[in-house]
């Protein structure tokens, strides 16, 4: 797999001046850094397949992880090349010949439901989706200290969240070692970035623990299960349906993991 990233140091923040209003009626101007929403179109074999709203860093990881969790690819070997333009606005993905894609019977474009906290993300067509059944993950032994350490990493602060309080974050670890951390507007994007990082660097997700800063509804659980991640931890709470899904597919789900 070849990855060609032409973008460098795109703006993540923008300074704005606003009027502050206090409870005592006092008003004054303040300046603050706020997060930038970045739009990126993803073309797979020259076909517009996704529109993503994100922050413009770790874009190749985001694309790779999203292709994986949307079942467009089953491994990094299915990708021949990922190209990200200099503005980070367009990603071009070339699949390997054995994943060239066959049209479904009607092959009509559609817009999928938008996941919560991933503002504006859309899957535009199902041309490459394989509809593979969800398979149980293989549980692994894990240590509670690993989870405490990841909760501490989050509590110690991530760069953009510390400045804006406007991002979710995700941490990828294996055998108690932190391998990668990232931030994004939405928790789904952050999880996809962590998954994409593992795929890009040949890390076996079946041996990994992932920690998310966000809630765990079913769509987050499905991403972890599809990726084969055995342990998913979160600072926040799960939904009842996500708990039921974790039991059914043998996903170890650890929530309210915070310092």
Which residues make up each language-model segment?
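Intrinsically disordered, low-complexity regions enriched in acidic/Ser/Thr/Pro/Gln residues
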Residues: 2-175, 180-181
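Alpha-helix initiation and capping sites
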Residues: 164, 185-188
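Histidine- and/or cysteine-centered catalytic micro-motif in compact active-site loops
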Residues: 175, 183-185, 215
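Feature captures the catalytic cores and cofactor-binding loops of soluble hydro-lyases/lyases
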Residues: 187-259
């Amino acid at each position: 797999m070849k990855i060609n990233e032409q973008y460098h140091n795109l703006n993540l923040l923008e300074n704005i001046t606003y009027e502050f209003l206090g409870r005592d009626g006092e008003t004054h101007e303040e300046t603050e850094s706020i997060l930038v929403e970045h739009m990126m179109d993803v073309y797979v074999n020259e076909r517009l397949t996704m529109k993503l709203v994100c922050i413009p860093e770790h874009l190749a990881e985001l694309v790779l992880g999203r292709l994986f969790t949307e079942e467009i690819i089953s491994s990094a070997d299915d990708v021949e090349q990922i190209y990200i333009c200099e503005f980070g606005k367009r990603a071009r993905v070339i699949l390997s010949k054995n994943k060239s894609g066959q049209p479904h019977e009607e092959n009509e474009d559609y817009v999928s439901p938008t996941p919560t906290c991933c503002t504006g993300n859309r899957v535009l067509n199902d041309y490459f989706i394989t509809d593979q059944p969800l398979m149980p993950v293989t549980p692994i032994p894990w240590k509670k200290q690993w989870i405490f350490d990841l909760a501490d990493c989050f509590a110690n602060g991530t760069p953009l969240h510390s400045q804006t309080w406007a991002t979710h974050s995700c941490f990828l670890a294996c055998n108690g070692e932190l391998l990668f951390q990232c931030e994004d507007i939405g928790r789904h994007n952050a999880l996809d970035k962590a998954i994409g990082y593992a795929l890009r660097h040949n890390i076996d997700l079946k041996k990994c623990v992932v920690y998310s800063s966000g809630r765990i509804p079913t769509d987050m659980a499905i991403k972890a299960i599809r990726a084969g991640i055995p342990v998913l931890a979160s600072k926040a709470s799960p939904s009842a349906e996500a708990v039921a899904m974790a039991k059914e597919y043998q996903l170890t789900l650890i929530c309210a993991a915070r310092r």
